[in-house]
Amino acid sequence: MEDFVRQCFNPMIVELAEKAMKEYGEDLKIETNKFAAICTHLEVCFMYSDFHFINEQGRSIIVELGDPNALLKHRFEIIEGRDRTMAWTVVNSICNTTGAEKPKFLPDLYDYKEDRFIEIGVTRREVHIYYLEKANKIKSEKTHIHIFSFTGEEMATKADYTLDEESRARIKTRLFTIRQEMASRGLWDSFVNPREAKRQLKKNLKSQEQCATSPTKVSRRTSPALRILEPMWMDSNRTATLRASFLKCPKK
């Protein structure tokens, strides 16, 4: 699974996921399913935000790659992917600037057009079940919830899907492709089934004990589908800024 994740996702997303797991004391070499889930969630958050801007009239517009209007205001502020201290700093700044109610839990995005925080969910289960779990945890009508599944289903607060249909279809297509690629490599069943995942985890731990001192040969082959899809969605005008702000950390 780890090899798949490194081939499938944009390097910046992989790096952010590694930092997040390290922050919570989790080992990505062991908890590979969680590594994949974090990368998937991060990518959906970035895809949700990319190419969406607010013009001078306050209307939401979509600006594709290469468009000269780079100075337009980004519609969404990305909170997910930052370390907790910086994330809360961003949330507090937004609340102070906009007057928004401070959420109890860290949200994933802030929508400057609709003036609301957004919680993004990506689930391997039924969307309505995951939606209810999110709603029960957050317990706030101020935070908008939007859930996506790997089967193309989605659910959002008051059926308000925020994005246009094409933008949402792009996210759904990406999730479906990730699922298909996992399935083709025999990874999907353990990713979606907790019992199978635990069995795989025990197998990984045993394998690590046996091969702790042995060199590991890693396959670098990437399927044609992944070569096409890998980081193509990333807004190149924003990548450098995101890398600088998200990955900044003191050198030890």
Swiss-Prot record:
Top-level taxonomic group: Viruses
Gene3D superfamilies: Influenza RNA-dependent RNA polymerase subunit PA, endonuclease domain
Region (Disordered): 202-221
Residues annotated as site: Important for efficient shutoff activity: L28, L65, K202, K203, K206
InterPro entries (alphabetical): PA/PA-X (IPR001009), PA/PA-X_sf (IPR038372)
Record carries keyword Repressor: no
Major subcellular site: host cell
Molecular function in Gene Ontology: RNA binding
Skewed-composition ranges (Polar residues): 207-217
Domain free text: The probable endonuclease active site in the N-terminus and the basic amino acid cluster in the C-terminus are important for the shutoff activity. The C-terminus acts as a nuclear localization signal. The C-terminus is recruited to host protein complexes involved in nuclear Pol II RNA processing.
Protein's name according to its UniProt entry: Protein PA-X
Organism: Influenza A virus (strain A/Fort Monmouth/1/1947 H1N1)
Gene designation: PA
